[in-house]
Amino acid sequence: MPVPRRVLGLSLALLSLVASPAVAAEREGCPGLVASGPAYLKQATLVERPGTAGSFLDRAARPEGQVGLTFVGHATFLVESPKGVRIATDYSESTRPAAPPDVATMNKAHGTHYSLRPDPRIKHVLRGWNPAGGPAHHDLQVEDVHIRNVSTNIRDWGGGTEYDGNSIFVFETAQLCIAHLGHLHHTLGPYHLRKLGRVDVLLVPVDGGYTLETFDMMEVLKAINAPLMVPMHFFGPSTLQRFLAAAREHFPVEFSPQASITLSRETLPQSPKILVLPGH
């Protein structure tokens, strides 16, 4: 259901007017983490892990400084911290890991991004919207992971704006800042970029219509400038290839043979690139 570009542009312009001009300086650090070193350290060496997306991954501790990332499907990733904390993004009835995570994040734009009946064994269910109204606010520590959110707006079903209906969730662990854009419906102004801080790994919806048109998503990617960007929320090869055709004008593109990879601060790319994990 493609929509006109920049349908929320007016509200974003107003946010930009009140935002601090010192955005770049504030984004040098990842809030809540010490990040005094250079943004990029050396060329990435992605360590593949056996298994398929959504397979059972036990809660064994990982080597210090290493974070597991598995593309389960649609907008759901499984993030595993060095101490074994397991986080499922945009956890829903249709797409979820085989074993219950410790933390589940959700967004409300469509039913494929949230669950009305999350597994009761999940210790922390974090909704990207506030059922009582206003923005959701999450700021919690789960062992070695700091989790927070940045609220954004969504289109309502009448074509208007539902304020604070989506959250960009940020997971900070092992000196990495991993941001999941959720069901993003508008570009990001200085206010959002300041709240995000430094982003090392960006999980990006690339459908080109239900979320953002591809042109606008490119603007988001360039503004955040994360070393590693991983596509999600595409509905088959044609949707993905349309995004990648536009992305190649700005970033190198690589493909992983495995849906599960290992990330670390030491192996971040020296310059931004897109890595495609198998699945959809």
List where the protein language model places each region.
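Metallo-beta-lactamase
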Residues: P21-R155, L176-L181, D200-V204, P237, ...
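Active-site-proximal loop/helix segments of hydrolase catalytic cores
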Residues: N153-I224, F235, T239-R242
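A Lys-centered signature of the CheY-like receiver
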Residues: M232
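Bacterial N-terminal signal peptides
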Residues: G9-A19
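Bacterial N-terminal signal peptides that target proteins for export
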Residues: M1-L10
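Residue-level signal for inorganic ion chemistry
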Residues: M229
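Short, structured coil segments at secondary-structure junctions
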Residues: P100, I224-N225
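Alpha-helical transmembrane segments and their juxtamembrane interfaces
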Residues: L15-S16, T112, L193
